[in-house]
Amino acid sequence: MSVATGPWGLTSAVPASAGAADAVSALLGQVRTALTAAWGVPVGPLGLRHACPRCGSAAHGVPALTGLPPGRVALVSFTRVRMPGTEDRARIGAWWAPARPADGLGLGVDVERADAAAFADEDGLGGVGFSTAERARVRELPAPERPAARARLWTRKEALVKAAGTGFTGDPAAVDTLTVPTDVVLVDLTDRLPGGLVGTLALRGR
């Protein structure tokens, strides 16, 4: 039975122009406020560390919160996207407080612009990043709906590999978005995002 339950949420977008350190600090401040409300206990200042499962580097890889109250578990994931109507990039974070600790927990979030050129047709990312079955699923839709559908499928792929803690390790087309693993819950975030954006949250438990 999946343990992918418990409160979760999204941060507001923080402009990347704020600088990487300030943007991350602002996102962690929002996560701190959300966790305090979710747990009903004060949460102090939070920090962030990384661990790459492939090379062991602490300069990149899966993000993990530091400074959590004793006995509490929470996960975070981050994404960057160019906001609609502007050339400015922004960072968006997701947090999850699992209902019970367990091995193998993972969280992944991805947000993309529905009108991004990469998803416009099958000559771009749409032709190489998706499986035959995924491309067939998109072709079932009216032509005007296909770019957004490709973008949404891509966010599912990104969220899945982030929740697995690996990132893409091979051909993105091999990451199946039509058959979701039993230990993963996928949440379509589109209705929670500004117009023109699509997104997916992946919560992985055991």
Name each model-derived stretch.
Residues M1-R206:
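Core catalytic alpha/beta fold that binds nucleotide/phospho-ligands
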